[in-house]
Amino acid sequence: VGLTQAALKTLESSGAIRIERRGRNGSYLVEMDNKALLTHVDINNVVCAMPLPYTRLYEGLASGLKAQFDGIPFYYAHMRGADIRVECLLNGVYDMAVVSRLAAESYLTQKGLCLALELGPHTYVGEHQLICRKGESANVKRVGLDNRSADQKIMTDVFFGGSDVERVDLSYHESLQRIVKGDVDAVIWNVVAENELTMLGLEATPLTDDPRFLQATEAVVLTRVDDYPMQQLLRAVVDKHALLAHQQRVVSGEQEPSY
């Protein structure tokens, strides 16, 4: 009890918290300054590993999450590939990482990670589909695969199962052009602009019949399992409803992203 009282007095005297004492009814925590509290646990800023913001959904997510940390120094490290984001998180380079639920479930089989925030379906991407040249969806022999994308690897394995289909390593952002050139027959891709497919002579087939395809659309935030201050900070500052509303305003064009 003595240590607890001493800690509370230190926090109170620094202005990090305000306690209201009510005699026999006890004492109540009535105000907290999260920015000031962070200094007491040696956290001067928060850095989140985030996908490259090449879609409005990603921009809205980045902008909405940053807005929740108002008053707290919060920064992004944008990088492609969930594997590298999680590796940097585990190595202590960053404090948290945004990945899909599908990727997160594969990483959580390892030790050292905590699923700290879940945002629901279609908060990470809209929908993945199988892209191929028109009329050739039944003739796929070579499928493109970016080995840095945990989602694409898992979904490709789920969709093609034990089929005799060759996996061809390529960059995710080159996928459509590689199909057009005939280097590969198909790729699993997050379709953002349907008109782009039409112009390229490609068609999209929705992925269904497996819950993992839906998991790939959900954004989650991972922390290190022993980073209790960061987990508590997320619980304290993030209003999920406000974050998602912010994301949708960015997607619809009502609000410019800021991240």
Question: Which stretches of residues belong to each language-model region?
Answer:
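Short, hydrophobic/proline-enriched secondary-structure or compact coil segments at domain edges
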Residues: 143-145, 188, 219-222
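Short, acidic/turn-prone active-site loops that include or flank metal/cofactor-
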Residues: 102-104, 120-123, 170-172, 191-194, ...
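Mid-protein regulatory/catalytic core that forms ligand/cofactor-binding pockets
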Residues: 52-157
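Periplasmic-binding protein-like
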Residues: 33, 118-133, 199-235, 239
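A ligand-binding cleft/hinge motif common to bilobed small-molecule-binding domains
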Residues: 98-111, 177-206
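Short helix-initiation/N-cap motifs at beta->coil->alpha
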Residues: 76-87, 166-180
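Active-site regions of enzymes building and remodeling cell-envelope glycoconjugates
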Residues: 112-117, 161-168, 201-207
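N-terminal hydrophobic or amphipathic helices and topogenic motifs
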Residues: 1-84, 93, 213-215, 227-259
